[in-house]
C-alpha cells in the first residue's frame, strides 16, 4: 500500500506563500489534491487486488478477433433465459420435473490459471486500463510542480521569499499603524487647521502649512516631540522601521529592473494549459478502452491445452468511474488555467498604481511601481488588498522622513544638544550639527542659541517651531539642502540677520533665502556656472532690502549684474575667486555706497579702474592677485574716504612715489611682495597707524619713518635689514614691532622709549645680546617678546626677573 505521506514532499511549501496565491491558484491546488487522491486510490487497488481473472475458451481461435467472449456472454444469457422460460412453465395443472445443471471441466490447476492471468494482463489488456492510475498520479504531480515551480526556482524563489519577508514585517510594523492612523486623523482636521492663526499653528502638534518648498508634501509634518506617549514608538521599533525602509528601497531597485517573476508565472501557466489540453484529449479518447470482458489469445496449447481465453478485468467498472471523475476535475482545473491566462492578458500587470491607496490614506507621494514589483503586488491584491495598503507606507518618502524625524528626536534630546553649544569668534552661542539625516525638533527647545550651523544635514526641514529661537540671528547651511514652511519663513524673514550658504551645486542654494528682507549679511561659498544666465539664484537679490554685506566665494569670470540690485544699501562686497580670472568688473561702478571691497584671488594684474569711481570706499583689499605694478594708485585719491589699502600677497616690485597722494591712509599692507626699496614719499601718509612690509626684499628702512607719529603697527619681518634708523624709535605710539628673520646684529638701546610696545618680534636675527633698556618698555610682557631663549638670557637678571614676574 502507498502511504499518502509519501507525496507530502511534492505539495509541501511555506505557509507564507499563500499571499501570492490568488483564488484560482488555491482552487487549482485543491483540485490537484483531489486528482492525486484518485490516482493514489487507483494505484492502491491496482497493487492490492487481483488485476485480471481468465477462463479458457473451449472454442479454438488463432487470433484475438476470433474469440467470441462477448457472444459467449450473450449466448449464455440467452440460454439462461431460455432455460428460465422452460423451467418456469405457464401455470397448468401439471409441470415438468427440474433439470440437473452440469459444469465444464477445464482440467487446469492454480499455477496454470496464475500464469494465464499474468500473460493475458500483459498482452491482452489495453495499456490505458493497466496504467491509468499511475498516469493520473504522474500528471497530477506535474501539475503540482508547474503550479509551484516559481516558488522553488532559484532565480525567483529568492525574490519571492525576500518580498514575503518584507511584506510581513511591513504589515506588522507599529510604524505602519501609526502612519495610517495619523493620516486619518489629520484628514479630518485639515480644513480647520487652514483657518487657524499663526500663533495657533505654532502651538498645535498636527499643524503644517504648505510652502513652495513643501506644498506638495502629502503628510503634514507633525511635531513628533509633542505626540502622546501612547502612540510614540520606542527607539527599538523606530530602528526596525528604519531598517525596513532601507530593505524596501533595495528590494524595489532590485526587482523593478526585470520581469523574471512575471515571465516565469506566465510560462508555467501556458505549460499547464498545454498539458491540460493534451491530457484531456487522450483521456477522452482512451477512456472507452477500459472493458470489463477482455478476450485473450495466448499460444499455450502445449502447456494448458487452450489458446484462447476470456478474461474479466475486475477493476474495469471502478476505473471507468474514476476516469470520468478525473476528467471532470481536470475540466475544472483547465478552466482555472484559462482564467489565469485571461487575467494575465486582460490588464497590464507590469504596472501597479497606488492611486486608490493615495486617495484613501492621504499619502500623496507613494510612487507607482513596475515590472516584477508591480506583478507581485497585483497577486497580493487578489489575496488581501490591505497588505498592499500597509506596504505602501514604506514606499513613501514623506513617511520615511517622518520616521527619521522621530528617530532623530530620540537620539538628540535637548540636553544633549545643549552640551554641543560653543561660542563663535564673534561671541555668539552656536550649535553645530554635522552629518545628521535631518533636523531634530528638539533643536528648537534650545532657546538660548544665537547661531545655528547645519553641515551636510540631509533634507533639513525648518518647521514653525523656529519661532521659539527668539535669539537666533545667524544661520549657516554648509552643503545642506534646507526647506522651510510658510510659518517658518514668516519668522525668519523678519528675524534672521546673517546667512552663510556653502554648496557644491547651484541647485543646492535654497531660493527662499532671497526673500529674507531683514537679512544684513549673505555669504555664498561654492561653484557657480560661468554662464550667469544659468544662475537663477543671483537674479533674486533685489528682494534683499536690508543687505549690507555680500560675500561670494566662487569662480566667477565677471561680476553678476544683479549685484547692482542691492547697490542702494550694500556696504561691503567681497569676491574670493579661487584663482579664476575676473575679467569684467563694470558692475562695480554701480556700487556707489560700498565702503569695503575685497577682490581676493581674482588674478588681477592691475588695480581695476572701476574701483576709482567708488567715492565712499574706505577699505580696498586685493589679496592674492598677480599685481606687478600699482602705478594706478594715484587714481585712488578720488576715493577720498579710503583709509585701508591691502595689496598683500602679490608680486609688486616697487611702491610709486605718488602714493603720497593718499593722505587719508591709516592702514597699508604690502607684505608678501617683492619690494626692494621703500620710497620716502610713503611716509608723507602721516595718518598711517598700520604698516606691514613683511616678507619682501627690503634692505634699508628710511629715517623718514619717524614722521609716522600715529604708527601703532609696523611689520618688517622676513626682509634683509641689517640696521634700524634711530628715527624709528620716535614712533612713541608703536604697539607692535615685528623685526624677525632679518639680518640685524643689534638693537638700539632707544627701544626703551617705546613705552606703549606690547609685542616685539626679534627671532631669527644675528643678535648676540639684547639691550637692558628693553626693560623700560612698560607694556611689554614676556609673552609679547618673541626672541630665542639664549638671547633672552643675555639680559640682566633684574630685567629677566621683571619679565618673569609679569
Swiss-Prot record:
Extracellular compartment spans: 44-130, 297-323
Glycosylation-annotated residues: 57, 80, 312
Membrane spanning stretches: 23-43, 131-151, 276-296, 324-344
Residue ranges of LRR repeats: 569-589, 593-614, 616-637, 641-662, 664-685, 687-708, 710-731, 733-754, 756-777
Cysteine disulfide links: 54-311
Assembly mode: Heterohexamer; oligomerizes with other LRRC8 proteins (lrrc8a, lrrc8c, lrrc8d and/or lrrc8b) to form a heterohexamer. Detected in a channel complex that contains lrrc8a, lrrc8c and lrrc8e. In vivo, the subunit composition may depend primarily on expression levels, and heterooligomeric channels containing various proportions of the different LRRC8 proteins may coexist.
Similarity section: Belongs to the LRRC8 family.
Protein name, per record: Volume-regulated anion channel subunit LRRC8E
Source organism: Xenopus laevis (African clawed frog)
The organism's taxonomic lineage, starting at the top: Eukaryota, Metazoa, Chordata, Craniata, Vertebrata
Amino acid at each position: 500500500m502507498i502511504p499518502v505521506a509519501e507525496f507530502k514532499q511534492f505539495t509541501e511549501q511555506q505557509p507564507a506563500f499563500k499571499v501570492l496565491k490568488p483564488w484560482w491558484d488555491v482552487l487549482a491546488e485543491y483540485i490537484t489534491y483531489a486528482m492525486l487522491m484518485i490516482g493514489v486510490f487507483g494505484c492502491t487497488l491496482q497493487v492490492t487486488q487481483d488485476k485480471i481473472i481468465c477462463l479458457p475458451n473451449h472454442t479454438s481461435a488463432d487470433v484475438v478477433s476470433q474469440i467470441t467472449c462477448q457472444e459467449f456472454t450473450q449466448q449464455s444469457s440467452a440460454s439462461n433465459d431460455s432455460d428460465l422460460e422452460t423451467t418456469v412453465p405457464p401455470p397448468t395443472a401439471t409441470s415438468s420435473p427440474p433439470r440437473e445443471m452440469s459444469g465444464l471441466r477445464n482440467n487446469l490447476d492454480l499455477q496454470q490459471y496464475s500464469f494465464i492471468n499474468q500473460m493475458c494482463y500483459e498482452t491482452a489488456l489495453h495499456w490505458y486500463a493497466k496504467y491509468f492510475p499511475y498516469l493520473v498520479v504522474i500528471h497530477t504531480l506535474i501539475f503540482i510542480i508547474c503550479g509551484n515551480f516559481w516558488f522553488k526556482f532559484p532565480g525567483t524563489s529568492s525574490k519571492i521569499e525576500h518580498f514575503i519577508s518584507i511584506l510581513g514585517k511591513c504589515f506588522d510594523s507599529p510604524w505602519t499603524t501609526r502612519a495610517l492612523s495619523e493620516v486619518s486623523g489629520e484628514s479630518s482636521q485639515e480644513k480647520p487647521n487652514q483657518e487657524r492663526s499663526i500663533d495657533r499653528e505654532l502651538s498645535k502638534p498636527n499643524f503644517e502649512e504648505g510652502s513652495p518648498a513643501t506644498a506638495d508634501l502629502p503628510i503634514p509634518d507633525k511635531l513628533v516631540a509633542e505626540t502622546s506617549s501612547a502612540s510614540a514608538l520606542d527607539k527599538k521599533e523606530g530602528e526596525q522601521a528604519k531598517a525596513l525602509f532601507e530593505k524596501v528601497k533595495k528590494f524595489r531597485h532590485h526587482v523593478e529592473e526585470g520581469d523574471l517573476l512575471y515571465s516565469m508565472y506566465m510560462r508555467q501557466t501556458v505549460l499547464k494549459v498545454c498539458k491540460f489540453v493534451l491530457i484531456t484529449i487522450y483521456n477522452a479518447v482512451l477512456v472507452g478502452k477500459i472493458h470489463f470482458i477482455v478476450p485473450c489469445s495466448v499460444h499455450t496449447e502445449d502447456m494448458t491445452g487452450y489458446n484462447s481465453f476470456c478474461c474479466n478485468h475486475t477493476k474495469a467498472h471502478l476505473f471507468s468511474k474514476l476516469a470520468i471523475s478525473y476528467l471532470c476535475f481536470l475540466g475544472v482545473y483547465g478552466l482555472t488555467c484559462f482564467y489565469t491566462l485571461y487575467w494575465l492578458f486582460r490588464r497590464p500587470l507590469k504596472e501597479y498604481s497606488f492611486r486608490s491607496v493615495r486617495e484613501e490614506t492621504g499619502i500623496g507621494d507613494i510612487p507607482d511601481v513596475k515590472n516584477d514589483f508591480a506583478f507581485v503586488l497585483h497577486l497580493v491584491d487578489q489575496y488581501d488588498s490591505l497588505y498592499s495598503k500597509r506596504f505602501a507606507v514604506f514606499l513613501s518618502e514623506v513617511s520615511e522622513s517622518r520616521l527619521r524625524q522621530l528617530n532623530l528626536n530620540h537620539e538628540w534630546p535637548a540636553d544633549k544638544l545643549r552640551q554641543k553649544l560653543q561660542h563663535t569668534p564673534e561671541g555668539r552661542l552656536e550649535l553645530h550639527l554635522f552629518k545628521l539625516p535631518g533636523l531634530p525638533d528638539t533643536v528648537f527647545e534650545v532657546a538660548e542659541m544665537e547661531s545655528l550651523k547645519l553641515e551636510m544635514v540631509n533634507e533639513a526641514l525648518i518647521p514653525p517651531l523656529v519661532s521659539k529661537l527668539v535669539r537666533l540671528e545667524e544661520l549657516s547651511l554648509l552643503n545642506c539642502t534646507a526647506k522651510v514652511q510658510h510659518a517658518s519663513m514668516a519668522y525668519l524673514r523678519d528675524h534672521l540677520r546673517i546667512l552663510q550658504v556653502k554648496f557644491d551645486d547651484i541647485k543646492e542654494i535654497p531660493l527662499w533665502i532671497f526673500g529674507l528682507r531683514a537679512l544684513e549679511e549673505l555669504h555664498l561659498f561654492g561653484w557657480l556656472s560661468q554662464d550667469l544666465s544659468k544662475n537663477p539664484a543671483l537674479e533674486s537679490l533685489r528682494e534683499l532690502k536690508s543687505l549690507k554685506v555680500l560675500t561670494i566665494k566662487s569662480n566667477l569670470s565677471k561680476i553678476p549684474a544683479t549685484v547692482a540690485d542691492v547697490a542702494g544699501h550694500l556696504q561691503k562686497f567681497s569676491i574670493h575667486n579661487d584663482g579664476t580670472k575676473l575679467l569684467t568688473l563694470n558692475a562695480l561702478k554701480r556700487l556707489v555706497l560700498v565702503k569695503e571691497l575685497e577682490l581676493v584671488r581674482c588674478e588681477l594684474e592691475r588695480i581695476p579702474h572701476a574701483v576709482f569711481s567708488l567715492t565712499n570706499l574706505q577699505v580696498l583689499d586685493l589679496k592674492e592677485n598677480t599685481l606687478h605694478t600699482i602705478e594706478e594708485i594715484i587714481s585712488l585719491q578720488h576715493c577720498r574716504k579710503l583709509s585701508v589699502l591691502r595689496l598683500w600677497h602679490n608680486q609688486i616690485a616697487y611702491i610709486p612715489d605718488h602714493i603720497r597722494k593718499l593722505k587719508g591712509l591709516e592702514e597699508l599692507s604690502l607684505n608678501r611682495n617683492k619690494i626692494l626699496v621703500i620710497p620716502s614719499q610713503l611716509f608723507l601718509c602721516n595718518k598711517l597707524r598700520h604698516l606691514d612690509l613683511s616678507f619682501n626684499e627690503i634692505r634699508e628702512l628710511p629715517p623718514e619713518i619717524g614722521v609716522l607719529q600715529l604708527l601703532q603697527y609696523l611689520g618688517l619681518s622676513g626682509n634683509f635689514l641689517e640696521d634700524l634708523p634711530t628715527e624709528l624709535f620716535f614712533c612713541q605710539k608703536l604697539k607692535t614691532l615685528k623685526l624677525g628673520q632679518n639680518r640685524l646684529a643689534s638693537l638700539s638701546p632707544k627701544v626703551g622709549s617705546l613705552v606703549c610696545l606690547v609685542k616685539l618680534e626679534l627671532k631669527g636675527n644675528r643678535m648676540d645680546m639684547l639691550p637692558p633698556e628693553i626693560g623700560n618698555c612698560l607694556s611689554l610682557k614676556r609673552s609679547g617678546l618673541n626672541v630665542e631663549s639664549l638671547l633672552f638670557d643675555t639680559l640682566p637678571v633684574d630685567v629677566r626677573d621683571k619679565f618673569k614676574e609679569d
